[in-house]
Amino acid sequence: MRQTYSFKKDFAGKTLKIDIGKVAWQATGAALVQYGETTVLVTVVASEEKKEDVDFFPLTVEYVERLYAAGKIPGGFFKREGKPTEPEILFARLIDRPLRPLFSKDFRNEVQVIVTVLSYDHENSTDIPSIIGASCAIMLAGLPFKGPIGAVRVGWDGKEWYINPSVALSNSLLLDLVVAGTKDAVLMIEGDGKEVPEEIFLEGIIRAHEQIGEVINFQEEILSMVNPVPFNYEPFVVNENLKKDVLEYVTVDQIRDAIFTPSKSERQKALEDLKKRVIEHFKPIYGEITAQIDEIINQEAKAILTKVILEEKRRVDGRRLNELRPVSCEVGVLSRVHGSALFQRGETQVLSVVTLGAGEEQIIESVIESEPKRYIHHYNFPPFSVGEAKPLRGPKRREIGHGALAERALLPLIPKEEEFPYTIRVVSEVLSSNGSTSMASVCGSSLSLMDAGVPIKTHVAGVAMGLIKEGEKFEVLTDIQGLEDALGGMDFKIAGTKNGITAVQLDIKVDGLSYEIIEKTLKQAKEARYQILDIMEKTISQPRPEISPYAPRIMVLEINPNKIGDLIGPSGKNIKKIIEETHTTINIKPEGLVYISAPDQESAEKAAQMVQEYTRDIKEGDIFLGKVIRVTDYGAFVEILPGKIGLLHISKYKTTGTGKNQTREEINLGDEILIKVDSIDPSGRISLSRKDL
């Protein structure tokens, strides 16, 4: 009989329940986590053998939503879940970030964490129980992990603070943050704000971290009861004799000269040539040593970089610690597109292109409800941007993650549909990469949106901040490039306007960040952001007054919702007629808003006129130019508006003369005649008259 455990705790006013040993017996570790009525199963499987010849920890995190969790049946022909959706990829990346830095550096066994969403209560998001469950499952597996960790969502509405707010409330808050960490330090931050000041952001991080200790204590209680067996693994250890021989064969000055080469491509070549020379020299003696040499050279390069930055306050390209690389901007770089911009920062170069469309919102299929997306940002990272030749096989997880981050950074500035009724797609093409491409795409997006005439009130800029740390000594680096990201301790991406922060994302390689480091980073990033925004404003300071002549024209009309049926007509007859005659696309909202998208202004105006005719209220005394569509013995039926027909009784015909000489006018099929609405009965039947006209 298997031993099962069930633990409960009140956490931010809701019940957090973790079941151990109930399901997934074959996994190395598993936890069934329920928060409110949202339930996730988190499993961890570790391979028994270490992965040879890799210089990284092979961790994979998968997040899988089963739509039955929210009582939904998947769309599409096959009616089953397929490849990971964008929300699933973003959640997987969110869960991965606080876990990865806490695994032992000598652990090279493959580890797969799978989070499966089993139940969703439409109130509690799945991210917080997923991170807590992943921490618990890893600890139960006995893996070499410096946990447990906790995670909390914190929100602010301008007055009140909320811990683990509901999904609906989170969507309406000025600040929405997910923070993960240990008892002593912060490991991961991800969130967005509506131009929130740095001080409020920091307060939110601190408030969240104060709650994390509760969750960690709860997990420690679970671990003390379950008492997991430590995972037995063969550690990755650098051969000390090889290390001694390498550092005698290669001098510190040679490594230093390689990493302090100004150009990225030249620096990479210098380091690769150095490693290649060392491998060729020692391979006959030690055998396959590629991973070992990578580790030795990288650790030595990191030590040199750390020493120079902490002691000399100097970076590999000669910049000061808080200095930006040279920034340049250009807008209107492509002629036929709706908006474009080229943003360059050092050797990082991004082309952002805007396309305006009508009624083409993106619908996301997920257990968590979301509004159709009117603003979409896609980020492409082709291999040529880093001087590589690789096959193109669609966007990778990193590209999806970076695209979503830049999207969130601009979203608070995107005008409401009532103000600007277009669907907006921005594509950022990375043309050259030397670090901080996601933040460059934020800047490029902002510039291209203004170039396209999208009425955003101000620019948004982003900057990536780095960290060099040794013991208690640390320095924060502004606008990190590739090497400083690879060898440094953090990549803290911060985007915003001059009014405040709109999006953040923190990745770290150290064991956590103190409040002091976070505060210094936010302050330094603000200074850099202001400098970038000043440069962007000199290029284009406000949106162009007109959209591109190549963009579709959209008109918005408001009609009485009760008239929607009149506009559509029987079997869609009326709306089809408008679309066919004007070559437009028409989208009708239930509240009575009619969106007309046309290739040119003339077509849009013609369609608008027809919509108004179909939905116009007819009143007694109104005069129309109508068309006779049927003639009978007792009168004529006249169409006064599309689909609106009245009876002109013979007694209401126009007459001439008097007495015996009085004659009634002759009306024939197809005649166009001026006519007046005489009366409308309670059932809506219209009586017409030609008298007195």
Curated annotation (Swiss-Prot):
GO terms for biological process: mRNA catabolic process; RNA catabolic process; RNA processing. It comes from Dictyoglomus turgidum (strain DSM 6724 / Z-1310). Gene3D superfamilies: GHMP Kinase, N-terminal domain (3.30.230.70), K Homology domain, type 1 (3.30.1370.10), Nucleic acid-binding proteins (2.40.50.140). This is Polyribonucleotide nucleotidyltransferase. One of its GO terms (cellular component) is cytosol. One of its GO terms (molecular function) is RNA binding. Residues 621-691 form the S1 motif domain. Residues 552-611 form the KH domain. The keyword Coiled coil does not apply. The keyword Manganese does not apply. Belongs to the polyribonucleotide nucleotidyltransferase family. It comes from the Bacteria.
